[in-house]
UniProtKB/Swiss-Prot annotation:
Native source organism of the sequence: Pseudomonas aeruginosa (strain ATCC 15692 / DSM 22644 / CIP 104116 / JCM 14847 / LMG 12228 / 1C / PRS 101 / PAO1)
UniProt key word Cell membrane: no
PANTHER family tied to this protein: PHOSPHOGLYCOLATE PHOSPHATASE (PTHR43434:SF23)
InterPro entries noted in UniProt: HAD-like_hydrolase_sf, HAD-like_sf, HAD-SF_hydro_IA, HAD_2, HAD_sf, PGP-like_dom2
Protein name listed in UniProt: N-acetylmuramic acid 6-phosphate phosphatase
Upper lineage: Bacteria, Pseudomonadati, Pseudomonadota, Gammaproteobacteria, Pseudomonadales
NCBIfam families, sorted: HAD-SF-IA-v1, HAD-SF-IA-v3, PRK13222.1-3
Pathway assigned in UniProt: Cell wall biogenesis; peptidoglycan recycling
Gene, per the UniProt record: mupP
Cofactors: Mg(2+)
Amino acid sequence: MKRMRLKAVLFDMDGTLLDTAPDFIAITQAMRAAHGLPPVDEQRVRDVVSGGARAMVAAAFGLSLDSPEVEPLRQEFLDRYQEHCAVLSRPYDGIPELLAAIEKAGLIWGVVTNKPVRFAEPIMQRLGYAERSRVLVCPDHVTRSKPDPEPLLLACSQLGIDPSRVLFIGDDLRDIESGRDAGTKTAAVRYGYIHPEDNPAHWGADVIVDHPRELIDVLDRALCDC
């Protein structure tokens, strides 16, 4: 990545900044137990996390997305998640070091997510990131979510930083499309919730990494004449 006088780094939340899948998996397992069913293979749920609650309950219960049984299960999932959205979620290995490096470099950071604010805020607070993050943009704050550029443009506006001075990091094509259309630099991460049929190499990101610590090197290169 060429030098870009970076001023801010924005993260997608699920599958990029945080591994929130353990809470999703625990809830779907509890739901199956409540419905008299045995545990499901965790990977079935993890593979479709990026598809949201509907995709996760469909996978957990072996249903098609258009099954009439999915909607009541989705609502049950969301009700349970409201009470247990910040129990097992953790930052990915290497994220604490990355955030420390961002702050040490004098940059600011924030989160742009498609997760509703009623879930996103408690998670950020519980993990101690609410005070450190300078912006949190959720679907509640915009008329169009990612892949539309509106959430990224709102975050940049709230920070008072031109999008060209921002790096947006995500684990889904919609993240890269949103960042690119907003005018930010983009980084795709392979460690997140990527569907087995997806290939980040085809997304058009400025850089692709396999581990959060690699992003420290990306920032170093972006901030120097190397």
